[in-house]
């Protein structure tokens, strides 16, 4: 009887080891596939001309491409496989399943040429595996004076410019390793008497590979049908125009990979790499890093490069170049506040400062 029990136990152990080896092989294969995709894509860029610049200016709602919060911006926006808080609503809806508590966030950026950008979001756990969230994005300026050929300093009349996006998000943890999420958002762009409206969708996935802390994500953002402005405008000849060309939304495909090469009780270093494929510009690679001390203080760094450019030196074909930032976690009794700052260099266009405040409740 004892021998039979030992035999059964050995068979079960061997079966478990085979399953573990099979799972490891699958995970390694996925990792190799991801790495191969980056390598092949970068290699092809040396052989095939980069025509991404010819796609510039073909899509609408450009404000949706502006990073939402300071943490993500400081890491070069290479965060689709990193996010674990309410900012996931913007970067990767599936990342909401990594958050351990409900959270609210507000972020402000002094954008270029006196433009202001705001992002606000909140999340709520229906249960351990199901999370919902809402978000609001705004890009706006002060009223601008109307100028003409004969009155270049202004006519005395003003017009308004502003963009908004209001979204609802749902994320679900399917297994301990795989999660997905989606955001449906109403988007409106207003310039003087013209306005453009659309309903767009974000879809994201998050997969823990089982190899240490390795994980990767696939995200499709701003997916929807073509749109055209409504309203009227006066052209240079003084004619009133009411019919306009349609434009596609700024759809973006993102593939990201992240892991922790250094993780101890008081120290953690996260490294991430991300490939972006926009429909209106050249493919680009983002690299990001975050150092955490004692789960209280954070330092971040990020780099963006168009496919084919060297990671060293100044970016040649993109305005956005280097970014960095810092953050601090402040315990406040029953809640926790996260304050983050980001500095982004846009070379000739200038510098953008962002600050974010997130509160856990």
Region locations from a protein language model:
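Short polybasic linear motifs
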Residues: 1, 6-18, 23, 29-30, ...
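A general marker of short, structured functional hotspots
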Residues: 23, 31-34, 57-59, 166
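Subset of outer-membrane beta-barrel
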Residues: 46-361
């Amino acid at each position: 009887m004892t021998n039979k029990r030992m035999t059964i136990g050995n068979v079960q152990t061997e079966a478990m080891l085979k399953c573990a080896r099979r799972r490891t092989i699958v995970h390694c294969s996925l990792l190799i596939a991801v790495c191969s995709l980056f390598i092949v894509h970068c290699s092809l860029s040396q052989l095939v001309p980069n025509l991404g610049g010819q796609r510039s200016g073909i899509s609408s709602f450009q404000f949706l491409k502006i990073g939402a919060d300071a943490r993500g911006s400081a890491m070069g926006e290479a965060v689709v496989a990193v996010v674990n808080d309410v900012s996931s609503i913007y970067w990767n809806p599936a990342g909401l399943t990594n958050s351990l508590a409900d959270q609210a966030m507000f972020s402000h950026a002094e954008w270029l040429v006196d433009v202001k950008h705001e992002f606000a979001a909140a999340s709520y756990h229906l249960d351990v595996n199901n999370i919902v969230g809402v978000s609001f994005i705004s890009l706006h300026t002060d009223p601008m004076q109307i100028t003409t050929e004969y009155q270049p300093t202004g006519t005395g009349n003003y017009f308004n410019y502003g963009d908004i996006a209001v979204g609802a998000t749902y994320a679900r943890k399917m297994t301990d390793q795989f999660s997905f999420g989606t955001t449906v958002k109403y988007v409106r762009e207003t310039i003087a008497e013209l306005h453009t409206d659309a309903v767009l969708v974000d879809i994201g996935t998050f997969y823990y590979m089982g190899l240490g802390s390795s994980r990767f994500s696939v995200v499709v953002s701003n997916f929807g049908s073509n749109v055209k402005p409504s309203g009227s405008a006066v052209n240079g000849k003084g004619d009133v125009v009411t019919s306009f060309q349609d434009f596609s939304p700024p759809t973006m495909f993102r593939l990201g990979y992240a892991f922790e090469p250094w993780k101890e009780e008081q120290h953690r270093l996260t490294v991430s790499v991300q490939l972006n494929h926009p429909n209106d510009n050249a493919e680009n690679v983002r690299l990001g890093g975050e150092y955490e001390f004692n789960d209280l203080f954070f330092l971040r760094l990020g780099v963006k490069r168009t496919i084919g450019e060297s990671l060293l030196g100044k970016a040649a074909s993109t305005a956005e170049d280097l970014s960095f930032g810092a953050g601090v976690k402040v315990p406040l009794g029953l809640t926790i506040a996260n304050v983050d700052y980001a500095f982004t260099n846009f070379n000739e266009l200038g510098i953008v400062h962002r600050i974010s405040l997130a509160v856990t409740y």
